[in-house]
Structure formats: C-alpha cells, structure tokens
C-alpha cells in the first residue's frame, strides 16, 4: 500500500492559504519581511505563513513523516437518551493507539452530521470520561455539576453533533503501566526532539483521519473544541490541520509565561516512577481539589526551556500568530474576563483579526467566497437579496467577498472563574451551527 506523508495527506486537494500580510509582530520585527499591500495578498502571505509555522515547529518538533494504517476498533457500549456511545481506538503511531468515546446521536444515523473532536482538560485519570459525562476529575469521581461544563462532549452530542471524546497521552486509558497520570518522561525518552504538545496535535490529526472514515459523518464539516488544557490544544490543532473546518479554544493558556512550572518543567530525574516511590503532589492543588494529585512531571514543550533559563532571550513566535495559522477557517476564542486580562488575549485577537478581515481571494488560488457558497444557508442569502434588493447572484457574491473572512473570527468573555458556564456553551452551539451548517436535531 502506498504510504503518504502527513504533509502530502493534508495538502492534497486542500485550499492553499492566501491572505493579506500584516505588519510583523514586534517580537519578530528583525526576522520577518516588511508588510505589503493587501493587493499583494496571494504573493506574500504563503511565505509569511510558512515562516510562522516553521517557528512553531522549531519549538514543538516536526510531525512524523509516515502515517500508519488506522486499524480502528469500534464497539458499542450503550444507547440512552437518543445517543449511542461507542468505545473506539485507532493507531496514532506504530506502537501507540488513541482511545476515545464516540457519541452518535440517532439523527446522524438517518442523515450525515458534522463531527466535533472534544479534548478534555487536565484530569487525574478520568480523561475522556470527563467530557463524555461519565466521571469528574478522577475515574472514581461522579460527573461534575452541569454549570461547570466539564461534560461538554455529551452536550454537543445532545445538540446533534457526532462527538469524539479522546484521551490525551498520559491520561485516561493512555496512562502507561508504571507511570503516573500526566507523566511525560516516558514520552520524552522515546521522542527526545518532539513535544507532548506536538504529539497531542498529531493525535487530533489522527482523530480527523478516523472521523472521515465514518459514513454518518460529514467529512468536510469537522470541528475541534476543548476547555483548559483542551482549549489550548484545540487552537494548535486548528492551526496545523487545515481539514478542521471550525475551531473553538475555550479557557486555554494563550500566553507565554517564563516560569518553570508553566511550559518546560525540569523533573528531578528522568527515571520512571515505581511502586513505593513517594507521592508527587502539590499542596495548592490539594487545597483546591481536596485530594492528592500524585501526578508526574508534565513537560509541555521541552525546547522552551532556554527561554525560561534566559529571561532576556527572544521568543521566536507568539499566540497571535498561532491564531493567524487558523485563518481563514472559523475560530472562536472563549475565556473568562480574568483570563482575557492575564493572557493578554485582546491584543492578540486584534492582530489575528487583521488577517481575517484583510483576507482576499486571488486568481489561481482557492476561493474563500466559494467556501461561503458551499455552506448550508447560502441559498437563503441569495433568495433574500435577489427578492428584496433585486441583486444578481454575482453582485451578492462581490459585495459579501469584501468582508474577507472577518466574520469568521471572534472572541467572547464571561464573568467568573476558570470554567465552561452555560453562556459559553450557548456561544459554542451558535458558532458551530453557523459555520458547520448544522440544524440541531437529536432524533
């Protein structure tokens, strides 16, 4: 069987990205080319985008070049409330499988539905069970209260979306024997030049591969969402997999903190945990959650450590540019008011919004306007403005194209703490319904 590289798979038949180039991020002023006129859209943005992507991959590590067969497993676990729950797994690497709950509303069995990859937050062993509404932070804990919103995968399925709730490596079923939850030491012994963030992105890519094999899924209408750790990863996944049609990052850390415990912890040693070792826990987490976390050292991006050790060292990229990599596909940033302040989200969103608002179609490149015309509901736009304004379809398209992709990017804050409250979940449903062309239906 012919083997394709990840890049070959992702770029085959997919739209090339073309947008106006922005003034360079001040941190990259010395490295990036000068800004150009929006009229030069198609000529300059692809090169700029490659520079941003390369800067991130230099930190994250490159993705594997060969893709193993999926070898999926799918077994029904339950059917209740109009939703069938399947336990699924599929190959991520030759010696590693992603485990997940697949939630399928009855309506999807009669008509193909969009699908959402739902990524859990930091848990202490519950992993995918938390987003599927089966457990709290730990496997033995009951599901959290609805107002907290941890079971967002179940809610999306109740809204009519096929939902894939995955386990991230080091959590849920993917805690290796002899290791603690959130212990990445084994991963870095195996992949010293990669990062757990890069690995998690890869696993989401493989999740897209899996969903596209299902005959009840609209294969071009796949979204990704997560909260907290999952929200952080959702933005990365949307940036690096152009098959993801709409992204929501909720409560994810979107700012660099040059602290040892934030991005690149250095463990006391690289030996695996063995039975009888003293517990690793955090008094502050014990105070907040009421139990010993007993977690391992979670090292997000190993190659970020030089920027912690040398506070004056220039960080080569930032999260506004990660948002730009998602463009022109729809992206929604959700966080609490405090997180908008502490992560400096507004300035980053304003920079990314320039890419979206300045997006223009260029002859010879795939059209953003064509994507609008292919989404459900565009026929209603034509019918309304042809009848009320006597406009031709070409004129309607010409006028709408002037907004670029500006309406495909937005941000939303809510009061309170680090959570996923009902108002944020309502925004989630509205965003996906709009951009994935979904009419809610469970049965």
Give, region by region, the residue ranges found by the protein language model.
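N-terminal secretory signal peptides and thylakoid transit peptides that target proteins
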Residues: 2-16
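C-terminal segment of N-terminal export signals and the immediately downstream linker at the start
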Residues: 23-43
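N-terminal cap/lid segment of alpha/beta-hydrolase-fold proteins
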Residues: 69-108
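Short beta-strand element of the alpha/beta-hydrolase
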Residues: 111-121
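Cap/lid segment of the alpha/beta-hydrolase catalytic domain
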Residues: 120-205, 259-262
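Mobile cap/lid helix-loop segments that gate and shape the active-site cleft of serine hydrolases
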Residues: 190-191, 249-322, 341-351, 355-379, ...
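Primarily recognizes the serine-hydrolase "nucleophile elbow" in alpha/beta-hydrolase
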Residues: 209-269
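C-terminal catalytic histidine-bearing segment of alpha/beta-hydrolase fold enzymes
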Residues: 362-365, 369-443
């Amino acid at each position: 069987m012919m083997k394709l590289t990840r890049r070959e798979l992702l770029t085959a038949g997919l739209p090339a990205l073309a947008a106006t180039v922005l003034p360079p991020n001040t941190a990259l002023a010395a490295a990036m080319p000068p800004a150009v006129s929006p009229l030069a859209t198609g000529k300059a943005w692809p090169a700029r985008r490659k520079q941003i992507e390369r800067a991130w991959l230099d930190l994250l590590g490159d993705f594997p070049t060969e893709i193993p067969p999926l070898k999926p497993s799918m077994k029904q676990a339950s059917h209740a409330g109009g939703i069938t729950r399947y336990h699924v797994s599929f190959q991520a690497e030759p010696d590693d499988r992603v485990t997940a709950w697949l939630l399928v509303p009855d309506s999807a069995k009669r008509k193909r539905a969009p699908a959402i990859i739902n990524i859990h937050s930091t848990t202490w062993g519950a992993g995918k069970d938390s987003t599927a509404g089966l457990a709290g932070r730990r496997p033995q804990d009951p599901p959290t209260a609805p107002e907290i919103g941890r079971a967002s995968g179940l809610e999306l399925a109740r809204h009519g979306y096929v939902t894939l709730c995955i386990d991230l490596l080091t959590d849920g079923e993917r805690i290796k024997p002899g290791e603690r939850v959130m212990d990445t030491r084994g991963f870095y012994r195996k992949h010293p030049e990669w990062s757990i963030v890069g690995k998690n992105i890869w696993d989401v890519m493989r999740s897209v591969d899996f969903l596209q094999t299902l005959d009840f899924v609209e294969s071009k209408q796949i979204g990704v969402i997560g909260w907290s750790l999952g929200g952080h990863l959702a933005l990365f996944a949307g940036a690096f997999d152009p098959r993801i049609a709409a992204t929501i990052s909720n409560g994810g850390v979107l700012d660099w903190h040059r602290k040892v415990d934030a991005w690149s912890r250095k463990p006391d040693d690289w030996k695996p945990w063995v039975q009888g070792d003293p517990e690793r826990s955090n008094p502050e987490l014990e105070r907040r959650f009421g139990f010993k976390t007993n977690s391992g050292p979670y090292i997000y991006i190993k190659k970020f450590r030089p920027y912690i050790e040398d506070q004056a060292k220039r960080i080569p990229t930032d999260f506004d540019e990660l948002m730009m990599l998602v463009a022109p596909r729809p992206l929604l940033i959700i966080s609490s008011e405090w997180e908008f302040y502490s992560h400096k989200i507004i300035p980053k969103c304003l920079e990314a919004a320039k890419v979206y608002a300045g997006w223009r179609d260029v002859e010879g490149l795939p059209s953003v306007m064509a994507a609008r015309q292919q989404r459900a509901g565009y026929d209603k736009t034509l019918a309304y403005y042809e009848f009320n304004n006597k406009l031709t379809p070409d004129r309607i398209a010409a006028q709408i194209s002037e907004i670029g992709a500006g309406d495909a990017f937005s941000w939303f804050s809510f009061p309170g703490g680090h959570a996923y409250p009902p108002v944020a979940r309502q925004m989630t449903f509205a965003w996906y319904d709009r951009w994935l062309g979904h009419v809610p239906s469970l049965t």
